[in-house]
Amino acid sequence: MGGEAILVEKTDEEREGMRTVRLRVPARAEYVALARLALSGLADILTLPDELLADLKLALTEAVSNSVRHAYAGGAGFVSIAYELTGDALAVEVVDDGKGFDPERPSPLEGEELTEGGLGISIIRTIADEFELHSRPGVRGSRLRFVKRLRQPV
């Protein structure tokens, strides 16, 4: 499998008020920008405020970057991203099949200033209205999902 990104599914069908865009990209740093670009496209459609888009991009960047950096330890793999629009919220789910970790283990930098890169989970928790993380050491795969309520229904 080469380095190409695969758009797995793009639907605009109204299934109980939900619209979903799915993207599957190689677990490499240069593909984080593609995940951000897909989010920017959705933001244009929804006419989201710039400040909200900036927060969403930061949370997304941290989630995808964590999978790229940690899940596969430099080896080959993929990261799947789903953007789900429901009512007045955007849910973003990032899934990998790499090495799991203990989500309860505190960050070594906890308590320091939040900046992009290094405190990803803390940053996402701060930005999101809802947050879920499923991963375990010694078990393959991690699933991170965050929800941000939008100011207007989608």
Predicted features by range, described:
Residues 1-22, 67-154:
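Conserved beta-strand-loop-beta-strand hairpin that lines the nucleotide-binding pocket
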Residues 36-39, 96-98:
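Short, small-residue-rich loop/turn micro-motifs
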Residues 37-61, 113-114:
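Conserved short strand/loop->alpha-helix "switch" segment adjacent to the catalytic nucleotide/phosphoryl-transfer site
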Residues 62-66:
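Conserved polar catalytic motif of the HATPase_c/GHKL fold
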Residues 22-34:
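STAS-typified acidic loop motif
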